[in-house]
Amino acid sequence: MNHANRRRFLLATGVLLAAPFAGAQPSKDKTAHVGILVMGGRAQRGHLEQALLQGLREQGYVEGKNLVLERRYLDGMMERMPDAARELAAMKLDAVVTTCTPSTRAAQQATSSMPIVMAAVADPVGQNLIASLARPGGNITGLSSQAEDIMPKMLELFASVLPKGAKVAVFVEARSNVHPRMWQALGPVAQALGLKLAKIDIKSPANVTLPAAFETAAHEKADAILVLPDEPVFLTRRALIVELAAKHRLPAFYGVREFVDEGGLMSYGENLRTAYRNAAAYVGNLARGAKPAELPVEQPTKFELVINLKTVKALGLTIPQSILIRADEVIQ
């Protein structure tokens, strides 16, 4: 989709979504029954649940009053996903919010009638989750991430703090459907920037393979780490990843700010809290009787650059003033 067409699509999406969402109130005495299916653990994702609940309050739904939220956090245990999805489908909820590709696909396989709301899922068209962004068809709608599209900009920003000819180890989730395409997209950009890339596959269990991956990166004399976005395996283990990066004194770059909040160096990507809050608008609309097939899928229009200055100093790096000025937030 070219820039002009994408702009027109986003404007149309805004009109379509704003009309039913703005100022809409729940039906009198109506209790919304909503599910959330999460690959990770609640301790690592609780702030995103709070963003969803905030958005639902803005829609007029308050937990304990006129909202029942069925939570299914799987703590990274992929094998539990199909059963959890079927369990939620059997409840005939107003909607179930899915937070990654595996949870969306599991919900899709569990039900063809109950509405499914994606919260920042990568490339739902390419993964055959929906027919198109404008008219998704079926029972899935919500928000798509654009991580694959912004990879060139992400690498360009990260390259600004690395020496020319630096070697970057790229962490790729071995089971991911989208990471292979992200990896391929990085090649030409890295060549133009004078960077060398080394792919490191992260297999299950990540708690074991992540430490080994950092050892591999160090052995291959990598100058930095790039953790590809859009995979719950990495986000759930962000504290471990940040700790290992500090241990090996490797600058590490990320696609979401949660890593930087934990002490990571730098991130560029969409704000997940905003995505979850926006997902609540879809839930509210569906609870009031809208059809998921007719609600366009929203794409992020703003991406944030976040830098942790404490980590910058600990690693002895220098961030160009031009990058600091562009940052949406600099954590002191």
Region spans (language model):
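Short hydrophobic alpha-helices and adjacent helix-cap/hinge residues
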Residues: 1-332
